[in-house]
């Protein structure tokens, strides 16, 4: 009898392990990685919803001046209510994951992409330090000017031992956090953009916004970025469109 109970308990444990129930949602591997299958499922759901609703998209309402790559966030509640999606992807923020699902080119060819919310949290953390500094000082803690109106951070004034960075969702490289003249924080994607210019075929020229090279060719968008263009074969800040 004891042997039988032991086998039953062992079987239940195996079921729990295989189903992932022994692990918190935040620790399950599908929450931590971009998943092409999950992207495809959401893409199909978007298209089904669009067909059902005369071209309308299931997106959350944002202010008009919201940066382009953070503007068209997928509304999973709307997708589920329309029966276009049975469950929220486990790697989505709404499902306990690290990513926010967003759309690019929604007007003519809506495509599903990801924002890595760990970078969002990194920006928010530095902003807390920055706001504390600005409560006591007139000007933001400018470091070195790397382009007209774009600065590194005087990180020591913010209480950091080293320059704050984020981990790139594109390359895994550490990307610097930079600041404009108003004290707005951005991620500097020049490392990733240089890699993309070398890797992907393109016809971009000076004055074009080359961030789309990343958005078009990877599962991610370059969130929290200033616009960039190409100059002498290298990525450069596209300063005249800094509000995009």
Language model features by range: what are they?
Residues 16-20:
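C-terminal motif of bacterial Sec signal peptides marking the signal peptidase cleavage site
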Residues 1-9:
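Bacterial N-terminal signal peptides that target proteins for export
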Residues 38-56:
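N-terminal alpha-helical signal peptides/signal-anchor transmembrane segments
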Residues 30, 34, 38, 64-71:
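Extracytoplasmic/periplasmic, Sec-exported soluble proteins
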Residues 59-120, 144-244:
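Extracellular/periplasmic head regions of type IV pilus-like filament subunits
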Residues 22-25:
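Bacterial signal peptide processing site
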Residues 35-38, 72-75, 122, 126:
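Stable alpha-helical elements in mature extracytoplasmic
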Residues 121-141, 163:
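Pan-zinc metallopeptidase signature
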């Amino acid at each position: 009898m004891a042997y039988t109970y032991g086998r039953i308990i062992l079987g239940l444990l195996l079921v729990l392990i295989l189903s992932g129930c022994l692990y918190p949602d935040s620790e399950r591997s599908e929450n931590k990685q971009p998943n092409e299958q999950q992207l495809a499922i959401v893409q199909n759901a978007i298209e089904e919803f669009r067909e059902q609703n005369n071209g309308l998209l299931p997106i959350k309402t944002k202010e008009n001046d919201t940066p382009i790559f953070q503007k068209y966030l997928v509304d999973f509640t709307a997708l589920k209510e329309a029966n276009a999606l049975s469950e929220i992807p486990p790697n989505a923020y709404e499902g306990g994951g690290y990513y926010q699902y967003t759309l690019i080119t929604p007007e003519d060819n809506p495509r599903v992409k990801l924002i890595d919310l760990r970078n969002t949290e990194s920006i928010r953390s530095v902003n807390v330090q920055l706001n504390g500094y600005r409560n006591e000082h007139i000007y933001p803690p400018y470091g070195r000017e790397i382009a007209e109106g774009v600065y590194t951070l005087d990180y020591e004034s913010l209480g950091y031992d080293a320059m704050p960075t984020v981990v790139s969702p594109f390359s895994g490289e550490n990307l610097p956090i930079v600041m404009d003249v108003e004290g707005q924080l951005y991620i500097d994607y020049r490392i990733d953009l240089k890699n993309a210019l070398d890797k992907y075929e393109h016809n971009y020229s000076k004055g074009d916004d080359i961030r789309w090279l990343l958005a078009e060719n990877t599962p991610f968008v370059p969130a929290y970025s200033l616009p960039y263009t190409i100059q002498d074969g290298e990525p450069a800040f596209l300063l005249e469109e800094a509000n995009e």
